[in-house]
Amino acid sequence: MIIFKNGKVLKKGRLVEKDILIDGKKIVLIAENIENENAKVIDLQGKFIAPGFIDVHVHWREPGFEYKENIYHASRAAARGGFTTAMPMPNLDPVPDCYENLKLQLDIIERDSVIRAIPFGAITKGELGKDYAEFEELAPHVFAFSDDGRGVQDANMMFESMQVAAKLNKAIVAHCEDNSLIRGGCMHCGCRSRELNLPGIPSVCESVQIARDVLLAEAAGCHYHVCHVSTKESVRVVREAKKAGIKVTCEVCPHHLISDEMDIPEDNGMWKMNPPLRSEEDRKALIAGVLDGTIDVIATDHAPHAEHEKNLTMTKAAFGIVGSETAFSQLYTKFVKPGVFSLQLLVDLMTKKVAETFDLPYGKLEEGSFADLVVIDLEKNIKIDPEKFLSKGRNTPYVGEEIYGIPVLTLCEGRVAYKDEEQFANIDL
């Protein structure tokens, strides 16, 4: 048994001091002063304790692309960022489009992951958009179905996939992008792309597919979840669909809340991501969507790449940035410290609301819940240094940025998944 003493937890939006008693995989007691002679006591000295974060959008790259990232490193990077549950996307080799392929990934997760990982199954075989994946045999073992990394272009294929997913009580999770509108773009089609003379990706290529899919989801009776919304039009479509009673939810990534196209200083592949950084007007619409509840959850879209794939110009570099290790801290620094978001809202968007959106038994800090928790030093600040990342991916454009609110200890089902060696070097749980 373990007692965390002198920690602070959120209660009705306020930080209050509580002790937490953990026995095995579960939290058994939360109270003001817990004494138990059989328990190991850890003094948190006023640090903040939150439920372990849940990330429904990560790219762990294994099997197939281990030169970019692997499950061993990705799970430890996630734990360092405070995440105790993650959902790896299916753009792998082999693609998890049948149980035989999925089993390869599940076995590696069992062997190498320090946190809970629930993978996606693909919608189509090989994510090629031509033949359906084996939904029925995948369903008991996957979080949801997605062809993330590309949009499902055929409306009938998406509609029939939604119908099957609904019968299996699974969500369809979509990367929304109409290929006919991309036209080889590498950044947002806007002021900055014109200044840099680079091909742009129009906002409508995202929002038009969301508009199509919410109507298909309504007809199919399916839970439809939109990945990484990035435009004001996308927020508007989701907001109106929710008002119409359609079961649609969506996520936003930290980088789309923090930055816009004008933050891109030069033609540098580290700033290339999909969706791209949009306009300031889009960024403000995303923030408004978070505040009014249109946007349900925050997800990182952690997308590691090898150095040779990112140290290129925008037209040649791979899409994607890493985010697992810095997501909470960047958002805390940018939005909670200035008072734009409450600490309660930010934590809920990464825990409680994720669990509610997908009916998961995680994301709670209460008696009887899993001992998934993260201890955060809200006063500690560091500068982002990719050389210190636990992820194999170093591809972030935020090098040198000062961030506050640093996770220092992460437990998943009562086991240490990450600890700050400076603060907890002598703790062996």
Segments predicted by a language model, with ranges:
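Histidine-rich, glycine-flanked metal-binding segment
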Residues: 1-51
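Divalent metal-coordination and catalytic microenvironments
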Residues: 7, 25, 46, 57, ...
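C-terminal cap of metal-dependent C-N hydrolases
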Residues: 7, 313-316, 370-429
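Metal-associated gating/positioning segment near the N- to mid-region
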Residues: 45-112
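Active-site mouth loops of central-metabolism enzymes
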Residues: 56-69, 92, 118-130, 149, ...
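Alpha-helix-loop-beta-strand connector modules within alpha/beta enzyme cores
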Residues: 99-116, 164-174, 326, 330
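Histidine/acidic residue-rich metal-binding segments in metalloenzymes
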Residues: 132-298
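His/Asp/Glu-enriched, well-ordered alpha-helical/loop segment
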Residues: 195-223, 270, 291-292, 296-298, ...
